[in-house]
Design a protein with these regions (language model features):
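Short, conserved SAM-binding/catalytic segment
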Residues: 1-8, 202-215
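Core catalytic lobe of class I
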Residues: 2-199
Length: 217
């Protein structure tokens, strides 16, 4: 396996191709894959061509690996129109509706206010099939064109895993999943092809989090 780009207690970040790194991970060594792959809608990335055709190739490559290495995998389907294709190729075990509220991007009849999330794995987990968390991270937050809110990551991590479990984010981006794992006492393996975003993720990990609960005790 390639050497880690960054490592601290419970957090390891690799700068490289996620498919190459995941091939080195043992079967069922990950408790949860929580990630947000490229959307295939021509977003501007410096290290990846975000075309729709590349999205199909990527999806068909990553899902078998997720199912091999992880107990549970959760990821956005990105485009509602792709659900028919997804159910024909790699049908999920569960589908969750993420309602973004007024922060969702406006679209035809407001359909972009919600996004389907794919769940692979049959581990017994306690979640509803409906998630309401505002997408309050602005486009360009932390230098990334499409960040997920940290509350989104923490919601899944806290419900699907226990303290000390290992979470994998093979499209780490600006490091939201890694930061959430650090806050919640989980181990995290992050993979990111862009060195720029690896550096941003490392910087986020070094930020102190103000604990209001401790102050109010």
């Amino acid at each position: 396996m390639i050497s880690p780009y960054y490592q601290e207690e419970n957090i390891t970040i690799y700068n490289g191709d996620c498919l190459e790194v995941m091939k080195e991970l043992p079967d069922k060594s990950i408790d949860l894959v929580l990630t947000d792959p490229p959307y295939g809608v021509d977003l501007k990335y410096s290290d990846y061509v975000d075309t729709e055709s590349n999205w199909f190739d990527l999806f068909e490559s990553i899902i078998p690996e997720f199912k091999r290495i992880a107990d549970v995998s959760i990821l956005p389907s990105c485009q509602i129109k792709r659900l028919e294709y997804i159910y024909k190729t790699f049908p999920p075990d569960w589908l969750i509706c993420w309602y973004k509220g007024s922060a969702g991007t406006s679209g035809f009849l407001g359909f972009n206010d919600w996004e389907p999330l794919l769940v692979y794995g049959k581990k017994k987990i306690y979640m509803h099939d409906y998630l309401a968390i505002n997408n309050n991270e602005k486009m360009g937050s932390y230098g990334h064109p499409c960040p997920k809110p940290i509350g989104w990551a923490k919601w899944f991590i806290s419900r699907v895993t226990n303290e000390g479990d290992t979470i994998l984010d093979p499209f780490l981006g600006s490091g939201t999943t890694a930061r959430a794992c650090k806050d919640l006492g989980r181990k995290c393996i992050g993979i990111e092809i862009s060195q720029k975003y690896c550096d941003i993720a490392v910087k986020r990990l070094g930020q102190e989090v103000f604990n209001f609960a401790e102050v109010n005790q």
